[in-house]
Design a protein with these regions (language model features):
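Catalytic donor/gating beta->alpha subdomain of glycosyltransferases that bind UDP-sugars
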Residues: 2-81, 119-170
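Hydrophobic, membrane-facing alpha-helical anchors
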Residues: 62-72, 97-104, 175
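Membrane-embedded multi-pass helical conduit in multi-pass membrane proteins
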Residues: 82-168, 183-258
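Short membrane-interface loop/juxtamembrane segments of multi-pass integral membrane proteins
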Residues: 170-183
Length: 258
């Protein structure tokens, strides 16, 4: 049993595969357990997962060492690298603002070139991913999910990448009870901050179009569209912080007794 990281289950699975044991997917429910009851608890759980997976990537990298097949190496590495999405996601949410505020090019290209090359690639990759994932995952909800976590997992994952021995195991709170409906301002303040920045960029971009005769209108419009997309995602992420009152007296799990 691996004890060097805070995600001992994933690390133990990696070690078992290295020793020649096989993994199998069984398409039937064999166990049930409680999930986190609030967004704050869910984020704390994912912080531990993210830190632990990056620790494994540093301490017992699946791309190296003996015992794994190439598909296993790719599968484990993909699961670990996934949790490094925090910083790229934050950069994506801030990327259109330098041009809107300071006329600084993030993508040094004309509006026509962006329409000709960037947009087709984005559309193609989105459709391809959705086709591969079928109805099991949906691109837009995945973006919202990553946006919710990005602000909070960025620092822990970067620290684990630099110094994998830092960090401690924190037990995920489960079985708690929400006695009233409330909005978690503490968790949502990061999203609200990004909403304010993007909304300010939207207003200033429209102001530049209206007042600057030399403004590159098409590029400004592309960045405004980018900002509007960010606002849609951030608005949905903020809405998740609304915690509903629980009316059930105890958790219930569907089962079939034969």
């Amino acid at each position: 049993i691996a004890v060097e990281t805070v995600t001992e289950d994933a690390h133990t699975s990696l070690r078992l595969n290295r020793k020649g044991y096989s993994s199998a997917f069984i398409s039937m429910p064999l166990a049930a357990g409680l999930a986190t009851e609030s967004l704050a608890d869910h984020i704390n759980q994912r912080i531990r997962w993210a830190r632990g997976m990056v620790q494994i990537f540093r301490i017992d990298n699946p791309l190296f060492g003996k015992g794994l097949t190439i598909p296993q190496r790719i599968c484990f590495a993909n699961a670990m690298i996934h949790f490094l999405h925090g910083l790229p996601r934050i950069i994506f949410l801030l990327a259109p603002l330098p041009f809107l505020f300071f006329n600084v090019y993030v993508i040094f290209a004309s509006g026509l070139m962006i329409f000709a090359y960037v947009l087709p690639h984005m559309v193609h990759s989105t459709i391809t991913n959705q086709k591969i994932q079928d109805n099991k995952r949906f691109y837009f909800w995945g973006v919202i999910y990553e946006t919710i976590l990005s602000w909070y997992i960025t620092v822990p994952t970067l620290v684990a990448l630099i110094s994998p021995k830092h960090g401690k195991f924190n037990v995920t709170a489960k079985g708690e009870y929400n006695e009233e409906t409330y909005f978690d301002w503490t968790v949502s303040k990061s999203y609200i901050f990004l909403i304010i920045l993007n909304f300010a960029g939207l207003i200033y971009g429209l102001y530049r179009i209206a007042t600057d005769p030399y403004a590159e209108v098409w590029i400004i419009l592309i960045n405004i569209a980018w900002v509007c997309y960010n606002l849609l995602v951030l608005g949905a992420a903020s809405a998740v912080a609304l915690e509903r009152k629980q009316v059930r007296s105890s958790p219930r799990v569907a089962c079939n007794i034969r």
